[in-house]
C-alpha cells in the first residue's frame, strides 16, 4: 500500500470517529426512551408513506406524496450558494470541513413506485446515498424503490440516517 492510500484511509477513519463522537454527544437520550418516543409519534400519524430522520442532524418526519422531495444541505461558509433549492435541509455537522451531505444529495418520490413504496434517487452526490445496514451504495443512474422498514443514509457513515415508514 502506498503512502497516499494510507493517508487517505487514516483521514477517512478519523472522519468516521468524529462522526461517532458527534452522534453520542448530540444524542444522549437513552435508546429505549428514544424508541418509545418514536413509537408514540408514529402512532399519531395519518395513513400514508413517510421518511423519518433518525440521526442527530435530521430528526423529522417527511410525508411522501406525489411530488418529488429533494434532500440536501445549505452551502457552508466557504462555498458559493447553490442554484438548486432543496425541500428538506439536513444540517451537516461540519461547517468548514468536508461535508458528508451534498447541497443537492438525493430525491424522494412517491409517484414512481406502488402506494406502499418510496423511490430514492442519488443526485450524483459526492459521498453517496447508502442502503443501511448492508452499506450498499445506490447507483445515481438507477433509482431504488424502498419499502416499509428500509433505511438509507446520506453519506457512508450512517449518521444522517432515514427510515421508510408506511402506515396503513
Question: Which residues are covered by each model-predicted region?
Answer:
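Intrinsically disordered, low-complexity acidic Ser/Thr-rich regulatory segments
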Residues: 1-99, 113-114, 160-168
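Forkhead-associated
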Residues: 65-156
Amino acid at each position: 500500500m502506498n503512502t497516499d492510500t494510507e493517508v487517505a484511509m487514516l483521514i477517512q477513519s478519523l472522519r468516521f470517529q468524529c462522526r461517532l463522537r458527534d452522534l453520542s454527544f448530540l444524542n444522549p437520550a437513552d435508546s429505549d426512551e428514544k424508541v418509545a418516543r418514536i413509537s408514540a409519534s408514529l402512532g399519531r400519524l395519518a395513513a400514508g408513506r413517510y421518511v423519518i430522520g433518525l440521526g442527530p442532524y435530521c430528526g423529522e418526519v417527511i410525508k411522501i406524496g406525489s411530488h418529488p422531495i429533494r434532500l440536501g444541505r445549505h452551502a457552508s461558509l466557504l462555498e458559493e450558494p447553490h442554484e438548486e433549492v432543496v425541500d428538506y435541509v439536513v444540517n451537516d455537522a461540519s461547517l468548514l470541513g468536508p461535508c458528508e451531505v451534498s447541497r443537492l444529495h438525493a430525491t424522494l418520490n412517491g409517484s414512481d413506485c406502488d402506494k406502499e413504496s418510496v423511490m430514492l434517487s442519488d443526485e450524483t452526490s459526492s459521498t453517496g446515498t447508502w442502503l443501511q445496514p448492508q452499506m450498499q451504495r445506490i447507483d445515481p443512474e438507477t433509482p431504488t424503490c424502498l419499502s416499509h422498514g428500509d433505511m438509507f443514509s446520506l453519506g457512508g457513515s450512517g449518521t444522517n440516517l432515514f427510515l421508510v415508514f408506511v402506515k396503513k
